[in-house]
Curated annotation (Swiss-Prot):
Gene Ontology CC annotations of this record: chromosome, telomeric region; cytoplasm; HULC complex; MUB1-RAD6-UBR2 ubiquitin ligase complex; nucleus; Rad6-Rad18 complex; RAD6-UBR2 ubiquitin ligase complex; UBR1-RAD6 ubiquitin ligase complex
Sequence segments annotated as region (Disordered): 143-168
MF annotations from Gene Ontology: ATP binding; proteasome binding; single-stranded DNA binding; single-stranded DNA helicase activity; ubiquitin conjugating enzyme activity
Name the record gives this protein: Ubiquitin-conjugating enzyme E2 2
Pathway field: Protein modification; protein ubiquitination
EC number of this enzyme: 2.3.2.23
Pfam families for this protein: UQ_con
Start and end residues of each UBC core domain: 4-150
Organism: Debaryomyces hansenii (strain ATCC 36239 / CBS 767 / BCRC 21394 / JCM 1990 / NBRC 0083 / IGC 2968)
Residue ranges with Acidic residues bias: 149-168
Listed CDD domains: UBCc_UBE2A_2B (cd23790)
Location in the cell: Cytoplasm; Nucleus
Role: Catalyzes the covalent attachment of ubiquitin to other proteins. Plays a role in transcription regulation by catalyzing the monoubiquitination of histone H2B to form H2BK123ub1. H2BK123ub1 gives a specific tag for epigenetic transcriptional activation and is also a prerequisite for H3K4me and H3K79me formation. Also involved in postreplication repair of UV-damaged DNA, in N-end rule-dependent protein degradation and in sporulation.
């Protein structure tokens, strides 16, 4: 049965397919339009450049009146990302508006990468390094960028293992 939330998510998906912003992609799981996989590519000329950061977006039937829960599944060292991968982003909490769609959520997260809000950090260590020891912060971020590449390799290895199992 189609609900208002599911219809809206399908519109969001069509919009992402037709006019995805640079450096972001997202799609619903094949069997559940309420759960999406997303990827944000680290913006150029930032410490996150060339990183491939994966996220999960979980919507409920109150979308778009209620924001989704968004969580990085890639390792992320950032002042506004908790160790669990959950984000501290105003548009996903007190500044949410039903006018936001999947595309605008992801572009907001992408811009947050290089412009953290250090006044209310989710990761105090990252915020302190960002404020007081920028070169150490950049080094830690670059490590997460390199780790994001390894995650891609692990996925390919898993796919190859499945192909081998299928062939046997």
């Amino acid at each position: 049965m189609s609900t208002p939330a599911k219809r809206r998510l399908m519109r969001d998906f069509k919009r992402m397919q037709q006019d995805a912003p640079s450096g972001v992609s997202a799609s619903p799981l094949p069997d559940n339009v309420m759960s999406w996989n997303a990827v944000i590519i680290g913006p150029a000329d930032t410490p996150f450049e060339d990183g491939t950061f994966r996220l999960i977006l979980q919507f409920d039937e109150q979308y778009p009146n209620k924001p989704p829960s968004v969580k990085f599944i890639s390792e992320m060292f950032h002042p506004n990302v908790y160790a669990s991968g959950e984000l501290c982003l105003d548009i996903l909490q007190n500044r949410w508006s039903p006018t936001y769609d999947v595309s605008s959520i992801l572009t907001s997260i992408q811009s947050l990468l290089n412009d953290p809000n250090i006044s209310s950090p989710a990761n105090v260590e990252a915020a302190n390094l960002y404020k007081d020891h920028r070169s150490q912060y950049i080094k830690r971020v670059r490590e997460t960028v390199e780790n994001s590449w390894n995650e891609d390799d692990e996925d390919e290895d898993e796919d190859e293992d499945e192909d081998i199992d299928d062939a046997e």
